[in-house]
Regions:
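Intrinsically disordered, low-complexity terminal regions
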Residues: 1-248
Length: 248
């Protein structure tokens, strides 16, 4: 009798687990099936109340303009019916910009951010982050995952740029040193960034363009290419058909 009860109890537990997993899966599935939202009405600009932050992470198809200023401000410009679906949440020291529902590509969302100091900018997907004016900071990190774009002017001690995918990072201004990592077919455009030393690493078919005064270290695995301005000493480590060339 005890064995029968135990077997029945085991079966009940198994059934409960299956039902729970089914309900959870259905919830996620229903969320994924929600249709995209189309912009309607007029464009509205809404100010968002947020906590202090020094890093920005864009996870949706939007264009973000970043300006350094004394006060922290976040303004979202979009069709009125899309405003509730645009999320601006601060997690730690990072402002995360995302959407609760997918939008049509033509319903472009524009976000204007003013912040005292910027330490890191990240784009995941196809969005864009553009600086208005020069970003002044000791260390600036830039990262694109996907086909997105970051375009900034900066005055920094060090700048670290990472591209994973087919995205583009474009940097102008001044930095003592620059570190670049490209994985895939992405691009780093830093012709207008004056650096003393730059370190570039490419895995894949990516391209990097740099202006270096003293020291350039290059490592390429694949068919990537590095072009540079200036008269630095150059150390190369190439596996594959990659190339390094000087622009006159």
């Amino acid at each position: 009798m005890r064995r029968i009860v135990q077997n029945n109890w085991s079966k009940l537990v198994a059934v409960a687990l299956v039902l729970n997993l089914s309900i959870t899966s259905c919830s996620f599935y229903e969320e994924d099936l929600k249709p995209s939202v189309s912009g309607e009405g007029v464009i509205k600009t809404e100010s968002r109340e947020v906590e202090a932050f020094s890093e920005i992470e864009l996870e949706t198809n939007a264009t973000v303009y970043v300006t350094e200023g004394a006060e922290t401000k976040v303004q979202v410009s979009a069709f009125g019916n899309l405003q509730p679906f645009v999320q601006t949440i601060v997690n730690g020291k990072t402002l995360i910009i995302d959407n609760k529902r997918s939008f049509r590509s033509e319903d472009q969302i524009t976000i204007y951010i003013t912040v005292p100091s910027v330490e890191k900018l990240t784009v995941r997907g196809a969005g864009k982050v553009i600086s208005q004016g020069v970003l002044g900071t000791d260390h600036l990190a830039l990262k694109v995952t996907g086909s997105g774009e970051i375009k900034v002017a900066a005055d920094a001690e060090t700048i670290k740029s990472d591209v994973d995918g087919s995205g583009t990072i474009e940097v102008a201004g001044h930095a003592y040193s620059q570190e670049v990592n490209i994985s895939g077919s992405g691009k780093l455009l830093s012709y207008e960034l004056l650096t003393e030393a730059s370190q570039v690493q490419i895995g894949g078919s990516g391209n990097a363009f740099a202006q270096v005064a003293k020291k350039l270290d290059v490592k390429i695995t694949g068919s990537g290419e590095v072009k540079y301005k200036g008269q630095p000493t150059v150390d190369t480590n190439i596996t594959g058909t990659g190339r390094v060339s000087q622009l006159i």
